[in-house]
Every structure is written in structure tokens, then in C-alpha cells.
UniProtKB/Swiss-Prot annotation:
InterPro entries per record: SAM-dependent_MTases_sf, tRNA_(Gua-N-7)_MeTrfase_Trmb, tRNA_methyltr_TrmB_bact
Binding of substrate, residues: 129, 159, 199-202
Protein's gene: trmB
First-tier enzyme category under EC: transferase
Keywords: Methyltransferase, S-adenosyl-L-methionine, Transferase, tRNA processing
Protein's name according to its UniProt entry: tRNA (guanine-N(7)-)-methyltransferase
Domain of life: Bacteria
Catalytic activity: guanosine(46) in tRNA + S-adenosyl-L-methionine = N(7)-methylguanosine(46) in tRNA + S-adenosyl-L-homocysteine
Membership in a protein family: Belongs to the class I-like SAM-binding methyltransferase superfamily. TrmB family.
Upper lineage: Bacteria, Pseudomonadati, Bacteroidota, Bacteroidia, Bacteroidales
Record's GO cellular component terms: tRNA methyltransferase complex
Function: Catalyzes the formation of N(7)-methylguanine at position 46 (m7G46) in tRNA.
Amino acid sequence: MGKNKLEKFADMASYPHVFEYPYSAVDNVPFDMKGKWHKEFFKNDNPIVLELGCGRGEYTVGLGRMFPDKNFIAVDIKGARMWTGATESFQTGMKNVAFLRTNIEIIDRFFAEGEVSEIWLTFSDPQMKKATKRLTSTYFMERYRKFLVSNGIIHLKTDSNFMFTYTKYMIEENGLPVEFITEDLYHSDLVDDILGIKTYYEQQWLDRGLSIKYIKFLLPQEGELREPDIEIELDSYRSYNRSKRSGLQTSK
């Protein structure tokens, strides 16, 4: 029999590689690990990579296995979902993986300047109604700048044509360097080990015949960031665990 939510929450609270700081607690509880992830937790100087909106955490666990010379931190607010990856990494003794349960809106409170090298955004909610909630919006780019190294790498992997198109326009509007871009990752010319990692939800979308889009771009520290002023056609389908789209056909 699988564990219920309360049992999963109890496990999460006991795991040494899980840090739980929901929005309601952050103002009252100082986060001592900020600026000390390398020294105090990972105990090495390997690059730190974040996965924001990690869901079950399978992608972080997969990356951790694939790249033992990097440190990975999976971030999400849903503790019961994160339990899957947190439990697997704990039981297998992985030392280069951690989990942070918090709201991504306050992610800059947990890392010091230049402490993070890369960010993965895997199947983020496209937030078609409000640009500032999109994890590739300039609102979030400014937050990432507070802790990402200059020209740090950002990976977007998505089934959403809306999210992919919006991110392309955001990149173009701000002249951000693009290292790779494709509208169909598994039929592209990209040769990379990351192709071997598929999350539970990603496989569902592939089974439904949806193509997976991918962008790898850099975020310089300098330069004012501007939001793209363009209407984008909304996704015509309802992705797993996303709220139903509105009656609108386009959005900025």
C-alpha cells in the first residue's frame, strides 16, 4: 500500500537533504544555507543546478546520476509530489541532490550572488493569463540574476507551444544568447545525454502525440530586461494538472 500525504510529509521532514521553507515561514525563519550550499551541504565546489517546479523530482534525480560532478537542487511547493524523488535519492545514498520545498516566487532568498550555475524549467505551467507568473518572464529573470552566475545557463523543456513561443519572444526582445532551440526535441539534431531522461508527465504528453520543445539560453547580468509586447495564441489543449484555459484565444 502506498503512503498517504501525512506519512510522506513525515518522511520529508526527516530527510537530511530536504529543506522546507514555505512562504509563510520564510520571513520568520532565517535560511542559514544561503551562500553556504557548497561548503555546508554538498561539501564540494561543483556547480549548483536548480530545477524549478520539479514535480516528483525524477528529472533532478536523473540529472544527479548522469552528472556526478554537479550538484542539483529540486524546488517545488508540493511536498507530497517531491517525496518520490526525495525518497529515491535518499534510499540510494545520492550525495549531490537536495530538495527545497518553497514558493518559487521567493527563490532568490535561498541563494547568494553567483551561487548557482544553471536552471532547469521542466514543464512549467505556462501561466497564459499573467506574464509575471511565467517562470521565463523578465520578472523571474531579474530574480534569477540575483543568484545566477553571469551568462548562467537556463534550460526550458515544455510541451506548451504558448510557453515556448513566449520564451522565444522574450529572448529575442532582450537579445539573450541562444545555444540551442528546437520545436521537437526528440526529432532534432541534438546529441545529448539529457534525451534519456523523461519525467512521468513528459511521457504522458509524448504518448498523446505532443512534441517536446526545448530552449537552452544564457542570462547575462547586465542590461535592462523588457517584456515582449505581442499577442500569442493560447494552447488549445489542457495539460495534466493545469487549470482549464479561459475563453480567450490569445494572450500577452
